[in-house]
């Protein structure tokens, strides 16, 4: 009896293992009932419950204006194309600005001519610039080398062939030093008065002994090349 039970148990186990397995690919999920799928917009096509974009359904992107939106009129140089203002250069060949109405235009000054509401400079109206002095203005006398022409002082080189400055009157002129000679109130250097420059030492001043290559002449050290035929350190 025990043997029959074991055989039956083995047979049942074989039947259970022989049952075909269910693949995940064979499992299908049905959509929930009563679920509304929204319609697909432009450029999209509904495939099952999914919206797939199809470029051929929207060859170019365009945006329509909101309904009942007032489009302002286009200004100068622009033309309305649909709801857009497009600039057309032929509608405005040149930029010009009209003055405000009832605006007084001041008269144009010298060298200028009024053209409409604009002052245009005309060189022929002012061949040379000149400025007249204020009336009743005293003009100071011109100095040396200058000649008064109208209200202006003009420099004339022939009136001052050489520049010279006279000293102030009653000013003591110090005596000229060595190598200089007094000419009027000026000291002029004369090289013949100082053929060689030499400086005498102060009295009672000890003169240090001269170093190599030098020989003492009076109170001065004079360099003698024969005393140092080659430089050595």
Curated annotation (Swiss-Prot):
GO CC annotations on file: extracellular region; nematocyst
Name assigned to this protein: Delta-actitoxin-Amc1a
GO molecular function: sodium channel regulator activity; toxin activity
Family (UniProt): Belongs to the sea anemone BBH family.
Propeptide: 19-29, 30-33, 61-63, 64-67, 95-97, 98-101, 129-131, 132-135, 163-165, 166-169, 197-199, 200-203, 231-233
CDD domains given in the database record: Ugr_9a-1-like (cd21873)
Site (Cleavage): 29-30, 63-64, 97-98, 131-132, 165-166, 199-200
Residues with PTM Hydroxyproline: 39, 73, 107, 141, 175, 209
Keyword terms of this UniProt record: Cleavage on pair of basic residues, Disulfide bond, Hydroxylation, Ion channel impairing toxin, Nematocyst, Repeat, Secreted, Signal, Toxin, Voltage-gated sodium channel impairing toxin
Domain of life: Eukaryota
Record-annotated disulphide pairs: 40-51, 43-58, 74-85, 77-92, 108-119, 111-126, 142-153, 145-160, 176-187, 179-194, 210-221, 213-228
Record flagged with keyword Transferase: no
Origin species: Antheopsis maculata (Sea anemone)
Signal peptide location: 1-18
Function, as annotated: May inhibit voltage-gated sodium channels (Nav).
Protein localization: Secreted; Nematocyst
PTM comment text: Each Am I peptide may contain 2 disulfide bonds.
Chief location: secreted
């Amino acid at each position: 009896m025990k043997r029959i039970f074991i055989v039956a148990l083995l047979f049942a186990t074989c039947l259970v293992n022989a049952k075909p397995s269910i693949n995940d690919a064979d499992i299908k999920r049905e959509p929930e009932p009563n679920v509304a799928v929204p319609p697909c917009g432009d450029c999209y096509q509904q495939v099952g419950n999914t919206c797939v974009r199809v470029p051929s359904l929207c060859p170019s992107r365009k945006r329509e204006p909101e309904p009942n939106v007032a489009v302002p009129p286009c200004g100068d140089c622009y033309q309305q194309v649909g709801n857009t203002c497009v600039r057309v250069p032929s509608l405005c060949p040149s930029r010009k600005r009209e003055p405000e109405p009832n605006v007084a235009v001041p008269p144009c000054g010298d060298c200028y001519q009024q053209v409409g509401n604009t002052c245009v400079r005309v060189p022929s109206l002012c061949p040379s610039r000149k400025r007249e002095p204020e009336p009743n203005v005293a003009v100071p006398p011109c100095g040396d080398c200058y000649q008064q022409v109208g209200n202006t002082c003009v420099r004339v080189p022939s009136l001052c062939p050489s520049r010279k400055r006279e000293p102030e009157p009653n000013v003591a002129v110090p005596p000229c030093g060595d190598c200089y000679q007094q000419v009027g109130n000026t000291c002029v250097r004369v090289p013949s008065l100082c053929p060689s420059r030499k400086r005498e030492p102060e009295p009672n001043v000890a003169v240090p002994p001269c170093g190599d290559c030098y020989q003492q002449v009076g109170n001065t050290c004079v360099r003698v090349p024969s005393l140092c035929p080659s430089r050595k350190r």
